[in-house]
Amino acid sequence: MARLRGAGAAGRCRPGRFGSSARRHGLADDGEPDRVLPARRRCSARRRHLVFGVQHPARRAADLRVRQRGDQGGHLRATVRRSRSRQRCAHRTHRLRRWRAPGTLSLTDLYAAASGDFFDFESTWRAVQPEDIVTLIYTSGTTGNPKGVEMTHANLLFEGYAIDEVLGIRFGDRVTSFLPSAHIADRMTGLYLQEMFGTQVTAVADARTIAAALPDVRPTVWGAVPRVWEKLKAGIEFTVARETDEMKRQALAWAMSVAGKRANALLAGESMSDQLVAEWAKADELVLSKLRERLGFGELRWALSGAAPIPKETLAFFAGIGIPIAEIWGMSELSCVATASHPRDGRLGTVGKLLPGLQGKIAEDGEYLVRGPLVMKGYRKEPAKTAEAIDSDGWLHTGDVFDIDSDGYLRVVDRKKELIINAAGKNMSPANIENTILAACPMVGVMMAIGDGRTYNTALLVFDADSLGPYAAQRGLDASPAALAADPEVIARIAAGVAEGNAKLSRVEQIKRFRILPTLWEPGGDEITLTMKLKRRRIAAKYSAEIEELYASELRPQVYEPAAVPSTQPA
């Protein structure tokens, strides 16, 4: 810590350098645990910092640097380190290392310049004011260039205590840090809540290994994006199906059938019968509790899902095995989480209630507006965009369309700018369509529904990378996306899954045609963000030719229709 204090001073972050001339530090996040200490020192020493992911090309990092320049000579100093543990990111990090604009320091440079006597830490932290900007979080850029969200100490403190009031956080609670630190969700759970409540954080450098890490961590509170929950679900189902011990296999099959009954009752909005309650208690004692231990969730008190919609079927599945998950909603502009309910109080299909201390209302066009202590200070150096987002009465226009029930539970319809309005003027939620189809197609990892201004809906489907290897190995097939996208059995299975999903949608929402892309979409790439949000405009532009073929008068090669009568297990 002392070394970092001196390092910060070497970066000219001395007391008195606040306001527009305050020094701003940038941290290039490679997912390694030692990124936390520099960020923590900047939180307590009245320095602003931002974190950007190593997936950003050098020109994006340079653009952020230019946009961060202060009017009175402030500078962004980027600290960049190269990851040796994640070879997939190594070349991208190397590109950032070659980008050494004037005034840029590496952590090595910063440590070398450190002086223990140069910095008065005590007086500096005492000078921190609630409305001082502590960090900048850049939006994902799904609808345009990323914007720097200015968050204050007051924002983050209110967020932490509001989460505690609703969910309950204890000293020593075990959590994981595995999502990108450029995202506020991981920063809140892995850094800010740890500082406020003394949680125990285990950093997992590669998010793809999170399932393997959970049994060692044994988290007591845990949250993830929907795709992680869906992968855990697929892993459980795979384990049950591949159990070689006959007695264990039968016990697992019985317990999972009981869990399925509980899930079905939840989906139907029905109470469990006394018989089912007793049967589930027995299944839990003999099998399900041991399954949770095996997953690492034996001591889990509550679990969350956020950042994107999650299928109700996934939530019901986990509730069935004794892991109730609360779906939450928030955004960087609201300092992370803005709605939540404890899993014991949650309602399936909703994102809970507005956190205590916030005000909310639904505008005439359905957009949800929020006012209160979690609203950001503004977008960095973009007063016009700030004025568009926060009106003169202090209401933040979230861009999300909501419904609310009589008890105050909120349901996200979709992003206001992403609603599908077909040729007949019918409004539809693409997220609802996508979640419904994805729940019936476990081999598909990502899909984008298309239909704005069209007479019917179509979809682009992309494989789940983790499903390809096992599926191909079991059948002796080439595991490449291109080969599987052309395999007749795979096409038939996915067509059956689309038909199954369509059966749960209204006629106008149903997918009439689809194509399976012979590629994978990587988080942080052209098509999806690190938290698996679709970059719809970029996808529409990149795959414009493929999309037009979906609407051709005659069925084109590699364009398919849902199976009229599902004749095989959906993929």
UniProtKB/Swiss-Prot annotation:
Topology of the protein relative to the lipid bilayer: Multi-pass membrane protein
Annotated region (Disordered), positions in chain: 1-35, 67-91
GO cellular component assignments: peptidoglycan-based cell wall; plasma membrane
Listed Basic residues bias regions: 78-91
Listed InterPro entries: AMP-binding_CS (IPR020845), AMP-dep_synth/lig_dom (IPR000873), ANL_N_sf (IPR042099)
Its EC number(s): 6.2.1.-
Gene Ontology biological-process entries: fatty acid metabolic process
GO MF, one example: CoA-ligase activity
Segments crossing the lipid bilayer: 314-334, 431-451
Stretches assigned to coiled coil: none
Further comment: Was identified as a high-confidence drug target.
Family stated for the protein in its record: Belongs to the ATP-dependent AMP-binding enzyme family.
Name this protein carries in UniProt: Putative fatty-acid--CoA ligase fadD11
